[in-house]
């Protein structure tokens, strides 16, 4: 043994540290589901792409490349309390992508790893008639979910404002006939009339004037027939008088 010996140290040498870092495999982010990588493995926040940073730290990337508030990676995917808090430069961002609910595209077979079932999706073509883009919420909603048929809208209006059936015209007429028939008709109880009924009060008054002799009687100029009303005398003269018929 030589007399010179190196002092023993508990700390690993720099060479051993580099060997340890080189042995760490590069896990693809698509298959990685564990807690976010820590700084002790040799990965810095600048080495991560914006998409990887989103998966690891839970940052929501907006339309203009700005990042929202950072969330704890351990609270979302594992038991680690380590979290990233950083700003992603706009130059490192891929083409604009948006947060879309996974249930908006059923049957795709994609299982989201993001909280609240959110997926990263590229915007569809502006000419696509099956989707509507809403910049306020950055979500795409199918057009059939927003459409409402005329039949459905009419049913909703009928349920909110029920229509009241108005009584028919025939029922009103029948009701008026019943009222008129229930009214007592005027009658004459003079000698010889014995309660004769009249359709109106004016007819009863005229009958009483005729019986009292207050009305001048009208005579036919041809045959001399006497009439209590001039209307009846005129009809008799022009249509029924036998003297006119014989003279013609």
Swiss-Prot record:
Its induction, per UniProt?
A: Coexpressed with the other cluster genes on brefeldin A production optimized medium.
Q: Does the keyword ATP-binding apply?
A: no
Query: Zinc fingers (C2H2-type): which spans?
Result: 218-241
Question: What keywords would UniProt list here?
Answer: Metal-binding, Nucleus, Transcription, Transcription regulation, Zinc, Zinc-finger
| UniProt keyword Zinc present | yes
Question: Compositional bias (Polar residues) spans?
Answer: 36-49
So what family is this one in? Belongs to the GLI C2H2-type zinc-finger protein family.
What superkingdom does the record give?
Eukaryota
Cellular component, GO, one term: nucleus
GO MF terms here are: zinc ion binding
- Region described as Disordered: spans on this chain: 1-49, 62-86
Mind telling me what this protein is named?
Probable C2H2-type zinc-finger transcription factor orf8
Main localization of the protein described in the UniProt heading: nucleus
Could you tell me where this protein is found in the cell? Nucleus
Physiological role: Probable C2H2-type zinc-finger transcription factor that may regulate the gene cluster that mediates the biosynthesis of brefeldin A (BFA), a protein transport inhibitor that shows antiviral, antifungal, and antitumor properties.
For bias type Gly residues, the affected ranges are: 65-77
The record's gene field reads orf8
